[in-house]
């Protein structure tokens, strides 16, 4: 990439009004090369095919609670569990967070580190780091003001131990924000049943050679998430359900229905929810 192009990318990344605009700069290509570029293309394949206005809006709103918490507390210690290629971690660092992203996929951590190197070369996201690690690898004394998980919790096992570990990593008054698929949604459950059979826990050998339990799309409800973390000392502050239709342009015309209030009667229609809890 030429110097003028890099300068333009730096301005657009730093000046992005939301995370969707931030990701769009990366989707245009040219900032990564080699294995990192290939991993990025595969990881964001659906967004590269279609990143429409509706999809962009929901992608931007998905991180709204975590984003607001970081902006309200510059320098907040942030942990992203299951960071993937690091888009949310990098964005939260741009908002003023001191961010650590962890993942158990070596290729994704390498891709996130490559993106971080680009950001830091452009003068951004200095307070950010990515580690190949599980939450169980984090020291007992580690404390975070915000823990963020996006479509990760349903993979983490053993579930009860995960909940206790996550709660222990939260500083007093720290927040937990989890974005998850809604187990009440019948269409989602049918799709998952066809794709993976019954929800189950399997043993996987990680990229580091260690065996660990893995939840095969063990999605849960917001009510169950609230109960699990309440038992571990994390009190629910809010739950927000959103989005009814998949990420395909054909559904854009129905977006008006997705703004309907999330009353109990229509909760099964929503695909996702965000849970926000605070450690007392």
Segments the model singles out, each with a brief description of its role:
Residues 136-147:
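A short acidic, Gly/Pro-enriched loop at the edge of an enzyme's catalytic core
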Residues 160-175:
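A short glycine-rich, Lys/Arg-flanked "PGG" loop and its adjoining helix->strand segment in the class I
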Residues 208-223:
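Acceptor-substrate binding/catalytic loop of class I
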């Amino acid at each position: 990439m030429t110097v003028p192009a890099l300068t333009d990318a730096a301005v657009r990344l730093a000046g992005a009004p939301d995370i969707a605009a931030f990701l769009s700069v990366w989707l245009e290509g040219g900032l990564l090369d080699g294995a990192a570029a290939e991993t990025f293309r595969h990881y964001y394949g659906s967004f590269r095919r279609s990143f429409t206005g509706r999809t962009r809006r929901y992608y931007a709103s998905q991180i709204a609670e975590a984003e607001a918490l970081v902006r309200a507390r510059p320098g907040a210690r942030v942990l992203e569990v299951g960071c993937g290629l690091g888009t949310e971690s990098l964005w939260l660092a741009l908002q003023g967070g001191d961010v650590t992203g962890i993942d158990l996929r070596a290729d994704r951590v390498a891709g996130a580190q490559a993106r971080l190197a680009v950001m830091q070369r452009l003068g951004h996201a200095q307070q950010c780091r990515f580690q190949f690690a599980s939450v169980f690898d984090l020291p007992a004394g580690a404390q975070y003001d915000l823990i963020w998980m996006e479509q990760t919790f349903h993979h983490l096992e053993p579930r009860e131990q995960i909940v206790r570990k996550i709660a222990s990593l939260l500083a007093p008054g720290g927040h937990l924000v989890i974005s998850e698929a809604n187990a009440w949604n019948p269409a989602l459950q049918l799709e998952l049943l066809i794709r993976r059979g019954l929800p189950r826990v399997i043993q996987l050998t990680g990229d580091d050679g260690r065996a660990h339990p893995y939840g095969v799309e063990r999605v849960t409800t917001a009510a169950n998430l609230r109960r699990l973390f309440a038992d571990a000392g994390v009190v629910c502050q809010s739950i927000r359900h959103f989005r009814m239709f998949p990420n395909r342009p054909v559904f854009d015309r129905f977006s008006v229905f997705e703004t309907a209030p999330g009353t109990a009667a229509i909760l099964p229609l929503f695909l996702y929810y965000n849970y926000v809890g605070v450690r007392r």
